[in-house]
């Protein structure tokens, strides 16, 4: 592969950053060698406690057990809201940007406090108490954050289901976590279209007799079906409640939320996060990874239905007293300039999005970026999947005008917060690399026998010891936690991802371990081949899978989406094969290339590779559930034009 270009830390940034290179290495060494001392200091620095802890941490990876700050007590909303009021009551906590560019709102910390307390009192009036589970099925409106924080205020456990999920998916999650209350809206708005949330909720709840209350936020004012025994309008319920709600003091290890993540097989896993450790991970990573400075406007484009929205729209920024932007819309509505127009409108300093969005916007051309100023931007970030170097360079050069470092963050729903990531003032950047571990994170690379790979090498990525934001259990099924994360390599947390470590100790995520190609006995990650394909200026996006090959065992099947206006032909096909040969070697030449107008993606933007593998293998009768796809019709096109008949 071509040698990556190194982007050194700008001197001016290093001089004013929270963490410079020397401090990173000193503090990282302390976090590994003296973890109890290091984490106790950080827990006192970042969080406000009602009662101190007895022990900082204990863990047993053979049993999948971990506790942090045991015996300590705190409330999440006191940390996110109340403690800021003496100095920040009139500062903006949340900027809300509606789907319609002419609609926005600013919510101060005082207004946030009052809204959360009123919402919490509505929940209490419906019988919700500490430890009860509450399901949230909402659009990206401020009330989604209020609902989360209202649960945390009274010690209830929230389970957010992304507003794009089907009634069936919603029902499964309500049943699994035994939620008695559901919070939703009449409709959502996304890209100029209405999303029938209440109608979907009604279909789901029809199969959930345990749900006694459905609290509905009026977003569009659309007519919706109404069950007078069960349904209540939030605005009506709030008329009779107070703006004071005493916070419930929670044990550090009390549950804060359950968030479902799809398993490779079987039903979704309810990832359970607890209070103290998770909040510390959220706050620390938000401040250090984005070098957040007081008064800055921070925008994470995720939905609160995903962990990125939990940690980096709500809990991390608010714990740090930041101004966090919530966006109801999509990056391409009404035009592909929307993100950059929002950055100009609200003077956004830090912008955090997914490689999928970056590639989509890159495919639309530079003119949409060039039509805006983006002068306020200081730090850029990516999350959700590895970013290929070409998209990284475009993001850096075109969006950031070559002056904004990119934080390529690797983490998971299960880790709670960033695990491998650059820090703006400390770590030189290599496009496509998540660089180095965050404080307290001990990554290891393991071979097929579970032996540690030292120095340069490639293997399965695992974590050697506990970190504060670690998953505590799979809700209601601790055996599944052990089976999924702690049994493959006993004594380690197994991430399910493969990684390569270079001569500088930088980590490169090579894709899910089940996305490893084995061609004639040679192993390579799908991400490597995809990166080679998208080097071509006519390629917008590519996804690579293996398929059964009579000679090689596995052949390489590439799905390629071209830039807008580009017509496919055999000449281009040959150029792409040559690109892979040039970048990786002859072994990486795709055997089959299918031109794909779109790829099957979940609503969070992740490519559903299971479907790509099935189509490539011609196993069309076992495609499985496609209900969580953003556009299920994409699959029909892939099947119709498949190459391996």
UniProtKB/Swiss-Prot annotation:
<keyword id="KW-0547">Nucleotide-binding</keyword>
<comment type="similarity">
    <text>Belongs to the ATP-dependent AMP-binding enzyme family.</text>
</comment>
<dbReference type="InterPro" id="IPR000873">
    <property type="entry name" value="AMP-dep_synth/lig_dom"/>
</dbReference>
<keyword id="KW-0067">ATP-binding</keyword>
<keyword id="KW-0007">Acetylation</keyword>
<feature type="binding site">
    <location>
        <position position="534"/>
    </location>
    <ligand>
        <name>Mg(2+)</name>
    </ligand>
</feature>
<dbReference type="Pfam" id="PF13193">
    <property type="entry name" value="AMP-binding_C"/>
</dbReference>
<dbReference type="InterPro" id="IPR032387">
    <property type="entry name" value="ACAS_N"/>
</dbReference>
<dbReference type="GO" id="GO:0005829">
    <property type="term" value="C:cytosol"/>
</dbReference>
<keyword id="KW-0436">Ligase</keyword>
<dbReference type="InterPro" id="IPR045851">
    <property type="entry name" value="AMP-bd_C_sf"/>
</dbReference>
<protein>
    <recommendedName>
        <fullName>Acetyl-coenzyme A synthetase</fullName>
        <ecNumber>6.2.1.1</ecNumber>
    </recommendedName>
</protein>
<feature type="binding site">
    <location>
        <position position="539"/>
    </location>
    <ligand>
        <name>Mg(2+)</name>
    </ligand>
</feature>
<feature type="binding site">
    <location>
        <begin position="384"/>
        <end position="386"/>
    </location>
    <ligand>
        <name>ATP</name>
    </ligand>
</feature>
<dbReference type="GO" id="GO:0019427">
    <property type="term" value="P:acetyl-CoA biosynthetic process from acetate"/>
</dbReference>
<feature type="binding site">
    <location>
        <position position="497"/>
    </location>
    <ligand>
        <name>ATP</name>
    </ligand>
</feature>
<keyword id="KW-0460">Magnesium</keyword>
<dbReference type="Pfam" id="PF16177">
    <property type="entry name" value="ACAS_N"/>
</dbReference>
<feature type="binding site">
    <location>
        <begin position="190"/>
        <end position="193"/>
    </location>
    <ligand>
        <name>CoA</name>
    </ligand>
</feature>
<comment type="function">
    <text>Catalyzes the conversion of acetate into acetyl-CoA (AcCoA), an essential intermediate at the junction of anabolic and catabolic pathways. AcsA undergoes a two-step reaction. In the first half reaction, AcsA combines acetate with ATP to form acetyl-adenylate (AcAMP) intermediate. In the second half reaction, it can then transfer the acetyl group from AcAMP to the sulfhydryl group of CoA, forming the product AcCoA.</text>
</comment>
<dbReference type="InterPro" id="IPR025110">
    <property type="entry name" value="AMP-bd_C"/>
</dbReference>
<dbReference type="GO" id="GO:0016208">
    <property type="term" value="F:AMP binding"/>
</dbReference>
<dbReference type="InterPro" id="IPR011904">
    <property type="entry name" value="Ac_CoA_lig"/>
</dbReference>
<feature type="binding site">
    <location>
        <position position="536"/>
    </location>
    <ligand>
        <name>Mg(2+)</name>
    </ligand>
</feature>
<feature type="binding site">
    <location>
        <position position="512"/>
    </location>
    <ligand>
        <name>ATP</name>
    </ligand>
</feature>
<feature type="binding site">
    <location>
        <position position="523"/>
    </location>
    <ligand>
        <name>ATP</name>
    </ligand>
</feature>
<keyword id="KW-0479">Metal-binding</keyword>
<feature type="binding site">
    <location>
        <position position="308"/>
    </location>
    <ligand>
        <name>CoA</name>
    </ligand>
</feature>
<dbReference type="GO" id="GO:0046872">
    <property type="term" value="F:metal ion binding"/>
</dbReference>
<dbReference type="InterPro" id="IPR042099">
    <property type="entry name" value="ANL_N_sf"/>
</dbReference>
<dbReference type="InterPro" id="IPR020845">
    <property type="entry name" value="AMP-binding_CS"/>
</dbReference>
<feature type="binding site">
    <location>
        <position position="520"/>
    </location>
    <ligand>
        <name>CoA</name>
    </ligand>
</feature>
<dbReference type="GO" id="GO:0003987">
    <property type="term" value="F:acetate-CoA ligase activity"/>
</dbReference>
<dbReference type="GO" id="GO:0005524">
    <property type="term" value="F:ATP binding"/>
</dbReference>
<feature type="binding site">
    <location>
        <begin position="408"/>
        <end position="413"/>
    </location>
    <ligand>
        <name>ATP</name>
    </ligand>
</feature>
<feature type="modified residue" description="N6-acetyllysine">
    <location>
        <position position="606"/>
    </location>
</feature>
<dbReference type="Pfam" id="PF00501">
    <property type="entry name" value="AMP-binding"/>
</dbReference>
């Amino acid at each position: 592969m071509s040698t990556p270009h190194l982007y050194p830390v700008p001197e001016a940034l290093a001089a004013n950053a929270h963490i410079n290179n020397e401090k990173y290495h000193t503090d990282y060494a302390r976090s590994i060698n003296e973890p109890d001392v290091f984490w106790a200091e950080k827990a006192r620095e970042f969080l406000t406690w009602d009662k101190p802890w007895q022990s900082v941490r204990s863990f047993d990876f053979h049993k999948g057990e971990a506790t942090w700050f045991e015996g300590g007590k705190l409330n999440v909303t006191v940390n996110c809201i109340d403690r800021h009021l003496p100095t920040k009551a009139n500062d903006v906590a949340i900027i809300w940007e509606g789907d319609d560019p002419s609609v926005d709102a600013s919510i101060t910390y005082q207004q946030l406090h009052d809204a959360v307390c009123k919402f919490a009192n509505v929940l209490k009036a419906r019988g919700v108490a500490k430890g009860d589970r509450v399901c949230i099925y909402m659009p990206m409106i401020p009330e989604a954050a209020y609902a989360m924080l209202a649960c945390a205020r009274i010690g209830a456990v929230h389970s957010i289901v992304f507003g794009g999920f089907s009634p069936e998916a919603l029902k499964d999650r309500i049943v699994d976590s035994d939620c008695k209350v559901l919070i939703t809206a009449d409709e959502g708005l996304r890209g100029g279209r209405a999303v029938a949330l209440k109608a979907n909720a009604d279909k789901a709840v029809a199969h959930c007799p345990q749900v006694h209350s459905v609290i509905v936020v009026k977003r569009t004012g659309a007519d919706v079906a109404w069950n007078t025994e069960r349904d209540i309008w939030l605005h009506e319920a709030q008329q009779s409640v107070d703006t004071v709600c005493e916070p419930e003091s929670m044990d550090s290890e009390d549950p804060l939320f359950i968030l479902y993540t799809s398993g490779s097989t079987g039903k979704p896993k309810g990832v359970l996060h607890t209070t103290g450790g998770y909040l510390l991970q959220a706050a620390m990573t938000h401040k250090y990874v984005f070098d957040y400075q007081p008064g800055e406007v921070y925008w994470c484009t995720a939905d609160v239905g995903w962990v990125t929205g939990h940690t980096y729209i709500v809990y991390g920024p608010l714990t740090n007293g930041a101004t966090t932007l919530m966006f109801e819309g999509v990056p391409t509505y009404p035009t592909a300039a929307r993100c950059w127009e929002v950055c100009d409108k609200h003077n956004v300093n830090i912008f955090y999005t997914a490689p999928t969005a970056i590639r989509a916007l890159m495919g639309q051309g530079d003119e949409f970026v060039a039509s805006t100023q983006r002068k306020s931007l200081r730090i850029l970030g990516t999350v959700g999947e590895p970013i290929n170097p070409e998209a990284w360079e475009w993001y850096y050069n075109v969006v950031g005008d070559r002056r904004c470092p990119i934080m390529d963050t690797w983490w998971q729903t299960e880790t709670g917060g960033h695990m491998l990531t650059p820090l703006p003032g400390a770590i030189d950047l290599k496009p496509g690399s998540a660089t180095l571990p965050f404080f307290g994170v001990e990554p290891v690379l393991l071979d097929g026998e579970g032996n540690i790979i030292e120095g340069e090498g490639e293997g399965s990525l695992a974590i050697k010891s506990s970190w504060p934001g670690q998953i505590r259990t799979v809700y209601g099924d601790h055996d599944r936690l052990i089976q999924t994360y702690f049994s493959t390599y006993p004594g380690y947390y197994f991430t399910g991802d493969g990684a390569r470590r270079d001569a500088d100790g930088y980590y490169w995520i090579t894709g899910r371990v089940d996305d490893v190609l084995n061609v004639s006995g040679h192993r390579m990650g799908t991400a490597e081949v995809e990166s080679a394909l998208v080097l071509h200026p006519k390629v917008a996006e590519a996804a690579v899978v293996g398929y059964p090959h009579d000679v090689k065992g596995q052949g390489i099947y590439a799905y390629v989406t071209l830039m807008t206006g580009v017509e496919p032909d055999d000449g281009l096909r040959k150029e792409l094969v040559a690109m892979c040969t040039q970048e990786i070697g002859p072994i990486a030449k795709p055997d089959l290339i299918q031109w794909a107008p779109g790829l099957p993606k979940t609503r969070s933007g992740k490519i559903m590779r299971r479907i790509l593998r099935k189509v490539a293998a011609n196993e069309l009768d076992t495609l499985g559930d496609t209900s969580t796809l953003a556009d299920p019709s994409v699959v029909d096109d892939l099947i119709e034009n498949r190459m391996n008949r």
